[in-house]
């Protein structure tokens, strides 16, 4: 009998996303003692929450059908020529960067570079980004990106609060010339912290003694270029710090903030080759003085050496970060915008200092020509000095001019009923300027002569603020200006790294699953990429349909009643969720409720976020099995019942198990007046099996860059939407362009909107059945690894049935005691086997947390398990003295090609060092550096490009 012929393509993508084949799945189930995936699921999910799933989605579409569906949605967006500006500008993404970086899985599927030996390529690109920012802003220390300009401004405000010597002040000055969306996010961030944001015109500012800090815009949002030198001195005289939000392209021509007194510079790198994307994702930047480096938010790439003394890069000063300092961290930000920072970095590498300056001069000269022509037409710009933006007093003609422009498919900036604005960019041409003149000209007026004006117009930048210092003198910005050279440079960097295109990345709590090509394709479509976030609503009908449908999909997956897609990272989702809880309590007159219970096992973002939301953290204990100690929770909830605001709990737990008592935990908190925040970091084990909104959660954030297939990008972008029950829906993030105006947590109404198509595609192709199977296979793969390795490494935590959820924790502490081999040694040795290490020492020191996801095949799981078992054999050889306790393959891992061909003095063979298993002979990853010296890097901090001689040595 022949196989049944399928006449439909429904659900065919499921098998592309799921790793194990049917026969492998059955064999793995038998290893665990089950005969079906349903039986395994039934055994893992606690009785108390079975039946809570409300997932009711149609069958999955084929890849071709889903692409056709989303193309139809995208076509509803109208692409007008946009001159709105306000922090967002049209730009050209150079084709070699688009093809070799943005569309290259070697770049977009990588994880945050916590393992430096396998991350040297993107670390170098990020160091280039830091050098770019430091050079342009005139401040010596820059981080490796933040989420967007508005949240960077909020980070600058809290940074100033920590460091200002005006300790009694709770007031922060923000110029009324800042971008409006920045001011909105500042207000959101300030209120829970008891900070008052005073918005005023700095040109009319008198006494400044009441402020601990200030934020100024350079050039101003309306186009003005102000000289802030005297004002900066006044603020410093009052012991206040000065932050400046600066336009990077303008800084190629203007005096950098660091040279006129700024303590901090922040802004967006969007116009360096990153599409508008309806508001994101874009890389923000943050730079400061050397004295303040230990208080910087975000990640910082620094130069160190490996064990051979060779230059190597790493993430520096990690003790500032939330996963270590928890509620005392400088920020709650984890994932930032690495992929976008790398695009901006390579944009600068490709154009170089001369190319960037030419672009800036062209933009400015066209703006000056436009302004002079408008003056001839009777419209004078309000600005005496400007870079690329103009404000025009158009009086009673304002509405008609907007209408005339839109009739020509052009958007101008709406300011008020008497004024409008224009911002030019690198895509503006002579013909575009002439069209603008035609729109503004009254009937019968002769249009200006472009050629004549181009020959006569003068610069409209203030002479006193023209840049004198050189930019981007490092050779990396002066070499790769042909496409051939840039293509090979990007390939060289990519070859240094390990990403999902080469190997499984089994990081616990990170869900490094497949980012399917069909999911990624719409991201680079112009219909999604070239829309301004503040374009008139009727032009974004496609995005509106996309977000409406995606919100409904996520409600179905979680059991919540409403979704906000605005938070542009998981950390911001946490923050938005706690703000919703806080606002809910305040609306009921319960302002005194400010205690947040957090289990001791929680990720460091939880306490850091609670602190940002104005809550006091009370830690609850965990029992010997890693579960929340319910009696301790009950006692603390009762003790603080009058002040209890919330609990933040991760489910399945951070320890990788489905806690049996989750319903009871939720009930205890509710009975004592609190709300339940369920961290959705581990949602990949629950979709289709149980729903947090149905077993006690009031709010959760979701990591679309984990469960729902947005790639990690080497450390961003991420998306962290929140789902809420109906009583919290009125308190979700708002925006000036939404029905609720207050509570914006990022600059754009839909955050990182242009990558939302990835999640839409994933859900649409998987359908309800596929999403459930993804959860089931994630659980199967984790338990298969756990079972294969348990006789070699103790599995630290399991549920009452001896099973784990979607990840497992291996306890290496006994090995450390018996052999001296540390978790770090095992992690580095895995590199010699071609693997990225699992999560190290989280949530328990001395352990490895492994999450294989549903996308990995049994063959890859076995390859990983075989590597771990082989490593255990090497450890036994250390234990019994066969291998030297100090000079062995683990202590010296990873091994480089240069070491292998050099003088060999180790008591073990070269073959054992680099070919410990036969499969490596045909497919070997060579780390570019040996083990990196972390202590050296922090003691000798260098966070900009070192000399060219260092590169030649590398």
Curated annotation (Swiss-Prot):
PANTHER family according to UniProt: GLYCINE DEHYDROGENASE (DECARBOXYLATING), MITOCHONDRIAL (PTHR11773:SF1), GLYCINE DEHYDROGENASE, DECARBOXYLATING (PTHR11773)
| A GO CC term attached to the entry | glycine cleavage complex
One Pfam family matching this protein: GDC-P
Q: Which GO terms describe its molecular function?
A: glycine binding; glycine dehydrogenase (decarboxylating) activity; pyridoxal phosphate binding
Q: Subunit notes for this chain? A: The glycine cleavage system is composed of four proteins: P, T, L and H.
**Species of provenance:** Pseudomonas syringae pv. tomato (strain ATCC BAA-871 / DC3000)
Q: Which family does it belong to?
A: Belongs to the GcvP family.
User: What enzyme category does the UniProt record give?
Assistant: oxidoreductase
Report the record's Gene Ontology biological process terms: glycine decarboxylation via glycine cleavage system
Give the residue range of the signal peptide: none
- Which superkingdom is the protein from? Bacteria
Cofactors needed by this protein, per the record, are: pyridoxal 5'-phosphate
What keywords sit in the KW lines?
Answer: Oxidoreductase, Pyridoxal phosphate
User: Function, please?
Assistant: The glycine cleavage system catalyzes the degradation of glycine. The P protein binds the alpha-amino group of glycine through its pyridoxal phosphate cofactor; CO(2) is released and the remaining methylamine moiety is then transferred to the lipoamide cofactor of the H protein.
Residues bearing PTM N6-(pyridoxal phosphate)lysine: 706
Recorded name of the encoding gene: gcvP
In terms of HAMAP family, this protein maps to: GcvP
Q: What is this protein called?
A: Glycine dehydrogenase (decarboxylating)
- EC number(s) in its UniProt entry? 1.4.4.2
Q: Which reaction does it catalyse?
A: N(6)-[(R)-lipoyl]-L-lysyl-[glycine-cleavage complex H protein] + glycine + H(+) = N(6)-[(R)-S(8)-aminomethyldihydrolipoyl]-L-lysyl-[glycine-cleavage complex H protein] + CO2
